[in-house]
Amino acid sequence: EIIGDIPIYMGYDSADVWAESQYFQLNEDRLCEKVAGVPPDAFSDLGQKWGNPLYDWDTLEKDDFSWWYRRMHKSAQLYDVIRIDHFIGIVKYYTIPADMPDARQGEYCMGPGKKLTDVINRAIGDKKIIAEDLGVSVPEVNELLEENNYPGMKVLEFAFGGDRKNPHLPHNYTQNCVVYGGTHDNETLMGYFIEHPDWELGYAYDYLDTRDKERMVDQVFRAAYGSVANLVIFAVQDILKLGNWARMNTPSTLGTNWKWRMKKGELNDSHIKDMRYLASVFGRENS
């Protein structure tokens, strides 16, 4: 199956914003006075100012969210599973003054919530959704996920801070979730364990029952595969046990992002055998 990753927002220079500007928060000169992003979080102390135009949800609703219907219907023709990035933004979205240098001085506004997910469900038919629900915990988001039976996400690199109730720890998972070692915005697993000091990794050492960095990655695989989660996804960089030089993206930076490529032969029969073995042990083979 192919999972298509759908960003919630459009680029300012996209065909959609140019051709259907009535659906976006633009002034009479077609400029953004406020833009999209997220407040400070685990990824960035300054937050993330993405700079995308915000949706004019009132206008979209008056048109029965037809633009979103067309978007999701087309995505369902291309992909088997659709991952909606920043799903929280459907419930409430963060607005940042366009002239601010970072995302610290923004505010939240309410989004369409169930009105939009009803349209999405009609548009995609029998295709499946993964909701990227990371970030600030919002009760309304959890309610919307349950109502639509959308699986949310768990990230193992977020698991070892806090206490034993951390929702990203495998023993706290519910079945209807998708587990990642890290997202495209995270360090690689090997990079995470190498770069972070012992005082940050104390609970990880205990939970994974080892201090050996390479074995810690193996133990993360086992913890995820052995959990009740319906689906487990690891980046190929983690299967190859590469350091942070191979990470996909560092948020709020420019330069080396999205440039890593896997070389021919780098993923070999030994890697495939190991992952197939884990799938067999924990009953995750393809049926």
Regions found by a protein language model. Give the residues of each.
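Conserved, well-ordered alpha-helix/loop/beta-strand core segments that scaffold catalytic motifs
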Residues: 1-10
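Domain-scale activation on soluble regions of proteins
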Residues: 260, 277, 281-287
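Membrane-proximal transmembrane or re-entrant/amphipathic helices at the cytosolic face
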Residues: 270-278
